Amino acid sequence: MAKPTRKRRVKKNIESGIAHIHATFNNTIVMITDVHGNAVAWSSAGALGFKGSRKSTPFAAQMASEAAAKSAQEHGLKTVEVTVKGPGSGRESAIRALAAAGLEVTAIRDVTPVPHNGARPPKRRRV
């Protein structure tokens, strides 16, 4: 039987893009897109091998940002706008890691959704 042919990754030449940082209480996901919203690179704390409560640490967010930035730079990315969503602990360290990886951060936007008193929140935890 013939081997199924895999699609080859096409190297995109993009100068500027948008880095979407989704920081939840349990994980941090970093996705880098072009200005139209097409994904260029992504990474998350869980994808890097962090398990359980270690995924929610600032260090895990930093490593996820560095991994996403590295693979985005292979596509020619130089400048990036940052949008941050969520209340997680990895927000600040993820932005710093993007800048430290060699990407020029031009803008930082907080796009955390705030309800106008929508759904009822879950009950308080009793530990």
UniProtKB/Swiss-Prot annotation:
A Gene Ontology molecular function term of the record: structural constituent of ribosome
PROSITE patterns for this protein: RIBOSOMAL_S11
GO biological process: translation
Key words of the record: Ribonucleoprotein, Ribosomal protein, RNA-binding, rRNA-binding
GO (cellular component) term, any one: ribosome
Xref: Pfam families: Ribosomal_S11
Record function comment: Located on the platform of the 30S subunit, it bridges several disparate RNA helices of the 16S rRNA. Forms part of the Shine-Dalgarno cleft in the 70S ribosome.
Family: Belongs to the universal ribosomal protein uS11 family.
Assembly description: Part of the 30S ribosomal subunit. Interacts with proteins S7 and S18. Binds to IF-3.
Descriptive protein name: Small ribosomal subunit protein uS11
Species annotation: Streptococcus thermophilus (strain ATCC BAA-250 / LMG 18311)
